[in-house]
Amino acid sequence: MVTLTVGTTMMASCSKDNSDEPEQKMVNGTDVNPRNVFPLGLPKKISEIVLTLNEKGQLVQFSEPNSNDRATFEYKDVALGSTQAPQVILTETDEPDKHVYELYLNQDGFVTHAKETHYSNDHIIGKATWDFAYNADNQLKDVKCSTDKKHIVLEYQNGNVVKTTTTTVGKPTEVTTITYATASTRPIENKTGVMLFATTLDADFDNLEVAYYAGLLGKPSKNLPLQSEKSGDKATFKWTLDGNGNPTVLNYSFSNLSENFRFPFTW
């Protein structure tokens, strides 16, 4: 699947800078747009994954060249806040498997509920539901999945996620702390809106993370994370920025792994 987790390639986009455009009032699913989350526009490319936008600037597909793995978005003419029908359909395909998500959005255009159907060879093999909640700043703070009763809580301080707690039936509780300044590095402003939930925050909500890049999972953190720690294992994130403050490379490593990881961004 096209995901944003360690050991996978990431996504890219064909986008323009919408920072000077006024934010338009959203009424229904056809109005949602990533510019409401990414003030400088989406990056053109991150690693090898391409984000394709339609003429309205909406994300319509994630796809990696020469691969059948893809995620597509379909926007519906359904009023925001309605629970009668989904405003967006997200389909993630990795043949022979396919996950279809019916996304229900609140008045701000963010997902609050999702119905997932898992197909294999066109036969339904599983279903799940997801629920999302946001804080007063419209940042994602709570994720629940019916599968294994998974529950992720994101705690914020000064506009940043400083702790994530994940509970799953039959598994130990996982707690990760995140820091945004070190002895040698000051906080880095997150000017572009980039969020890597699974990789940098240890908040793993499976295939649905791609919905963030469609502008559907809330507002970004104030700063870019520099370190995280879980059960004594530490991760270090080193960002390279261009003159406009856009991240051009994320290099990161884990204390319990010898391998280093690198995600380039093209703007």
Feature roles, as predicted:
Residues 10-13:
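C-terminal motif of bacterial Sec signal peptides marking the signal peptidase cleavage site
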Residues 16-267:
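Buried hydrophobic residues that stabilize the cores of well-folded domains
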